[in-house]
Amino acid sequence: MKKYLWLWWAVCVGHIQAQEVLIKHDVSHLNVIEGKEIERPIEVDIELFKENLLPLQERFYIPLEAKPIIYGYTKRYLSYKWIGKVIGLSDYYFPLFDKKIRQYELPYDIKYLAIVESALNPRATSPVGAKGLWQFMPATGDHMGLKYNSYLNIFYDPMANTDSAMRYLKQLYERYNDWLLAISAYNCGAGNVDKAIRRARTNDYWQVRKYLPKETQAYVPTFLAITYVFYNYRDYNIEPPIFKYQFTDFVIATTTKAGSIKEVAEWYNTPENVFRFANPQILTNYVPKGTIIYALGKE
């Protein structure tokens, strides 16, 4: 019986991989991160995959099931040579995400959605114009309070972008009372999810899924696969790089005068390269007076 179940999974996974839609990532920001890259795709044993899922299913607030499509996307992400660098980078951003998750009383595992959205690139910009760690479209971002000008783009501000994402996700969950549907709506909009629910005549995500746009059909399984990878990467001998700082090590300050990035970094006792990394929202070498910044020290 076990042999036949394995064959069924293999057939399902093969069919899924032939039809899968991949979430595209711009990972150029990872080039500056020193760390060991995966040299060849990692083998993902089906039985180990199922075994590792059991404790997650018990503690995971968002439903995580042992479905072939999730296994398929897990294999895909464990084939990316950069996955270890993203795991390392998460140690820098996740304390910020956890802080905002606590503030808005959301499930902690929602933070893995940012990997799907941007691979933790604070300046990520999609072909359709979505921006930042959590990939806000201009209209949605404007509604959530994200602004920009020639000097600053608050879409790229890690804290502002994350705060807006948590508020928006909370609104979507309150609308659907189902995290998989809320996550789908984050990707394709509530209107498309509502339409899919009407066509499916149910609000069960796995039955609604086939009526969603193609990319959104891949979105939730990708999120669940990434969650699995982040919880179990040690089992696959992935060695993420270690960062010296976390985003929450920086204090929030408002500049009292204008200056160059180099000058402002010196005023706030922060190495220039660290200051630039912590403040991707600053677009030029000029920092206007009254700019909210993140620094290691006070002026």
Name each model-derived stretch.
Residues M1-I23:
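Bacterial Sec-dependent N-terminal signal peptides
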Residues H15-E105:
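An acidic, Gly/Ser/Thr/Pro-rich helix-cap/linker signature
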Residues S79, I83-F94, Q103-L106, S126-W134, ...:
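Solvent-exposed, acidic/flexible segments
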Residues L106-R123, A182-N187, F275-N279:
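Short, functionally critical alpha-helical segments immediately adjacent to catalytic or ligand/cofactor-binding
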Residues V128-S150, T162-A165, L169, V193:
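Substrate-binding/active-site groove segments that recognize
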Residues L169-A196:
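Catalytic and binding regions of secreted/periplasmic enzymes and modules that target cell-wall glycans
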Residues Y211-L212, V274-E299:
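Extracellular LysM carbohydrate-binding repeats and other cell-envelope/extracellular binding modules
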Residues P241-N269:
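Primarily a LysM-type cell-wall glycan-binding module
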